[in-house]
Amino acid sequence: MENDKGQLVELYIPRKCSATNRIIKADDHASVQINIAKVDEEGRAIPGEYITYALSGNVRARGESDDSLNRLAQNDGLLKNVWSYSR
């Protein structure tokens, strides 16, 4: 919902799990949101440029967050040649 100035006034903005594409519930206190900064040629972070991944508590509880994060980063071109047990 927006106020008369056009600003968001919602207390909760729903997110989707990047690994499973399911909505993360408001009471999922085990979920995490990870920002990975984009870097320039010198290895310095570019201010304000990052890629965000949200992982639900269910993915973390099953121990699949590491493999999921590697898969997502490979799909976005951040990692190359990462060994995966599922291959």
UniProtKB/Swiss-Prot annotation:
It comes from the Eukaryota. Keywords: Cytoplasm, Ribonucleoprotein, Ribosomal protein, rRNA processing. One of its GO terms (biological process) is translation. One of its GO terms (molecular function) is structural constituent of ribosome. The keyword rRNA processing applies. InterPro entries: Ribosomal_eS21, Ribosomal_eS21_CS, Ribosomal_eS21_sf. One of its GO terms (cellular component) is ribonucleoprotein complex. It is found in: Cytoplasm. The keyword rRNA processing applies. Component of the small ribosomal subunit. Mature ribosomes consist of a small (40S) and a large (60S) subunit. The 40S subunit contains about 33 different proteins and 1 molecule of RNA (18S). The 60S subunit contains about 49 different proteins and 3 molecules of RNA (25S, 5.8S and 5S). Belongs to the eukaryotic ribosomal protein eS21 family. Required for the processing of the 20S rRNA-precursor to mature 18S rRNA in a late step of the maturation of 40S ribosomal subunits. Has a physiological role leading to 18S rRNA stability. This is Small ribosomal subunit protein eS21. It comes from Candida glabrata (strain ATCC 2001 / BCRC 20586 / JCM 3761 / NBRC 0622 / NRRL Y-65 / CBS 138) (Yeast).
